[in-house]
């Protein structure tokens, strides 16, 4: 089911699916985790151009609306391309370069659609902490599809 929902959002651009995914995150995640400013994991520039939208951004916006929380797009990707298709060792050895575009909120809820190795979330958390975040909690809709 998770694979179908992620695929519907990412590849068929069925944006209402993002709200359903956000509802599941809200329902399943412990309440203490779901606080702070919502920050989506930034997309690769090539993927954003090709798709014309940001699936993680849509999920983050839907979650922010459900939680009535602020949303901040304060991260961007720099180079290194796709993680999809890389083996675990490659992903860990060559994490994406993530940079903060602005100062980070003190408390952040980092949102992505799928967790594979955690290297992208780790890179995002490091970038957020480097510009002022003191608490970074990550949530994803699915793990390894």
Identify the role of each PLM range.
Residues 1-62, 84:
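Extended interfacial segments that mediate partner engagement and assembly in macromolecular machines
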Residues 23, 27, 61, 65, ...:
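Short, well-ordered alpha-helices that flank and scaffold nucleotide-derived cofactor binding pockets
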Residues 37, 72, 109, 136-139:
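A structural signal for isolated positions on well-ordered beta-strands in alpha/beta enzyme cores
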Residues 40-42, 112, 140-142:
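Short beta-strand/turn micro-motifs composed of small residues
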Residues 45-52, 57-108, 144:
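Short, glycine/charge-rich flexible loops or terminal/linker lids adjacent to PRPP-binding catalytic cores
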Residues 101-117, 135:
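Mobile, glycine- and charge-enriched loop segments
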Residues 122-145:
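PRPP-dependent phosphoribosyltransferase catalytic core
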């Amino acid at each position: 089911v998770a694979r179908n929902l992620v695929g519907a959002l990412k590849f068929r651009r069925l944006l209402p699916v993002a709200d359903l995914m956000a509802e599941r995150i809200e329902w399943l995640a412990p309440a203490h985790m779901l606080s702070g400013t919502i920050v989506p994991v930034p997309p690769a520039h090539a993927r954003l151009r090709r798709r014309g939208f940001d699936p993680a951004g849509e999920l983050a916006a839907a979650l922010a609306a459900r939680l009535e929380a602020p949303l901040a797009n304060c991260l961007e990707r720099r180079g290194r391309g796709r993680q999809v298709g890389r083996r675990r060792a490659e992903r860990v050895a060559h994490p994406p370069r993530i940079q903060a575009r602005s100062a980070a909120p003190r408390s952040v809820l980092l949102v992505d659609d799928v967790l594979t190795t955690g290297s992208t979330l780790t890179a995002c958390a490091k970038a957020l902490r480097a510009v002022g975040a003191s608490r970074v909690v990550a949530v994803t809709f699915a793990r390894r599809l």
